[in-house]
Amino acid sequence: MGKLTRFGLAAVVAGTMTMGAAFAQDGKTVKIGWAPWSDAEFVTKLARKLIEDNLGQKVELVQTDVAPLYQGVSRGDIDAMMMAWLPETHADYYKRVEGKVENLGPLYEGAKLGWIVPDYIPESEISSIEDLKKPEVREKLKGEIQGIDPGAGLTRLSQEAIKKYGLDYKLNISSEAAMLTTVDRANRSEGWFVATSWSPHWMFGKYKLRYIADPKGALGGAEHIDAVARKGFKEDNPKVAALLAKMSIPINELEAAMFDAQETSYEKAVDKYIADHPDRIKEWLSQ
């Protein structure tokens, strides 16, 4: 449980429990949607823990794909989501619902999308997307780029990048789990691969990977990940909305917490993060 003892953590939480009792009048179960991405899972489960333990409300987590998430929040079927990648990755989704949702602000900044290769591939062979055109490189990669799920903004941008660079490659659209399997298997035998990826992600703490250059900017620039809620959420759940608006995590801390979650569990990683950052948690919960 980190440097704090169980007693110490209890004291931190107890300090906010009086607020939790006062906030109980909001009362309703809060529905928070998320897609099965590592960063989204951690911040969503962190929010659930803080809401249930300190604000006196139950939280129902709704797991689905990205498009249904935006639709659900815009219709009011889902109260909030904590994984709006802006300004580029989720631009198409966000434009469709912008007038029907409330943006509560960024949860973390400095995120990025890109294509990765393992460090054991020499940079003289692959340092840029342009290098994928080399016949010998394409042969070693079998003309394939390992992708993630079909609804992801990264998938759309990767499809556009293949066209912009004139690559004779197939994008294997699947899931984050399939991408991670490719990365893991290749690293065991030092096999060649290129995969679509993003930061923050725990795998950068486990494997030696690097992004390759994108000179045409096809995959976008720096991103911020925002919490987005349905219209009227701030009025119906002012305390929860205030918490989500205050939550802000440095990206290096988030990646470390995500790695902890892979080594233990998301629940244990959430508990550890709360124990290790009592002052920040107290600030988030202050009204």
What annotation goes with each model-predicted range?
Residues A22-I32, K134-K142, R280-Q287:
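Immediate post-signal peptide segment of exported/extracytoplasmic ligand-binding proteins
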Residues D26-D39, Q57-V62, K142-Q146, L244:
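Short, well-ordered beta-strand elements
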Residues W37-S38, E60-G72, L171-T182:
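Short helix-initiation/N-cap motifs at beta->coil->alpha
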Residues E41, L154-T155, E160-E190, A222-H224, ...:
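An extracytoplasmic/periplasmic, membrane-proximal ligand-sensing/linker region
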Residues A47-G56, D131, E136-L171, A275:
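Ligand-binding cleft/hinge of the Venus flytrap
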Residues M82-V97, R185-R210:
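A ligand-binding cleft/hinge motif common to bilobed small-molecule-binding domains
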Residues G99-G147:
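A conserved helix-loop-strand patch within extracytoplasmic ligand-binding domains
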Residues L113-E123, E223-D236:
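A bilobed periplasmic-binding-protein/Venus flytrap-type ligand-binding module shared by bacterial periplasmic
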